[in-house]
Amino acid sequence: MLTNEYLKRVYDGLAKRNANEPEFLQAVREVLESIQPVVEKHPEYEKAALIERLVEPERIISFRVPWVDDQGKVQVNRGYRVQFNSAIGPYKGGLRFHPSVNQGILKFLGFEQTFKNSLTTLPMGGGKGGSDFDPHGKSDMEVMRFCQSFMTELYRHIGQFVDCPAGDIGVGGREVGYLFGQYKRLTNSFQGGMLTGKGLTFGGSLARTEATGYGLCYFTAEALKCMRNDSLQGKTVVISGSGNVAIYACEKATQMGAKVVTMSDSNGYVYDPNGIDLAYVKDLKEVRRGRIKEYAETHAGATYVADCTQVWTVPCDIALPCATQNEINKESAEALVKGGCTVVCEGANMPSTPEAIEVYLSNGILYGPAKASNAGGVATSGLEMSQNSERLSWTFEEVDAKLKGIMEGIFHASYDASVAAGSEGNLMVGANCAGFLKVATAMMAQGITY
């Protein structure tokens, strides 16, 4: 609840101006509620209108993306880049190609990205972009033509010292390759650090593909060790999603001794009491691009439920939501509690509604918020940029070790900040306060024109 008059005034004004952007308002309110103890200790923030500046993107770029489909028909989509905050480094955040993309969702993601990047300790600001283009069902040539058209406008707004995009939902290695190739052609320069998630043959980093899922498990393991004197060993884990984050969270959780029993897609979820056959899921999703229901057709004992929202009714010790925003509501959270869940760490961006988070906290669930627990992807993007700058390529083990250290550091920074804020163990409050303080200090140092 917002009790600070300054923060309440800022939020009310923002809500009036952005009434049609519920995801953005949800993200802002969560942060403002968390940072109240910090703001009350710094009256200079109000004088400098720091919060008013923090919640407004520095720049929003919107543009048309015309492209020609395989039938020779001209299609037009809308492209965006939200350059939210560059106080601690060049804008950094993914590109999302999905029909649901709109300005409000990208503002929410860019706002969250600002604090997530701050938590990594790497010099990266916050941004997000994308298009309402849907790559599913499109041929490789159609995807290539779209990516080239998208970059033909975006290239003038980005660069390794300005704004460094990456992949996200709908933007994988194929799309990143097409985008990078067009940028290189338009600028006649090879700026490896201007786009991350690249292929290994042209500046990509080992362990980048695995990073978000692996990082989620490293964060979860460190939280369990320090807050519960426990580990992932022997735990039953429910995972939503079957994309990059879910697949590699499943892989690392299994390596750490857990048993993952579910994965899902937008149509439904599969439950395998014997543990998910990850090799099959990788082939299904990364090679054949099939639907998760095919898993149950080939695995004895596995069952498929044609409602992805019901995955949270499966009994478990740990839940790792890795699909999309607001996938867990109050009822889903209550189902997790009823099923014996004691830990929820987020792999997707803001997958829990505020009401769900209240259920977690009121029932003593160890809750790892997305901006902390899923920061592994952008952290390793930062490591990819470092390798590009040094003209070096680190081994998988080197990158993985750095990732593990960063994720453990994020946990400790969040925990310590929760103590300082008077909310010991509330990692949501801690992550918001820790991420905010670094950005706020930089903004104050750079003057009110910032």
Name every feature range the model reports, one short phrase each:
Residues E44-K73:
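Structured beta-strand/loop patches that form or line metal/cofactor-binding pockets in enzymes
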Residues G199, G204-T313:
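Glycine-rich phosphate/diphosphate-binding loop of Rossmann-like nucleotide-binding domains
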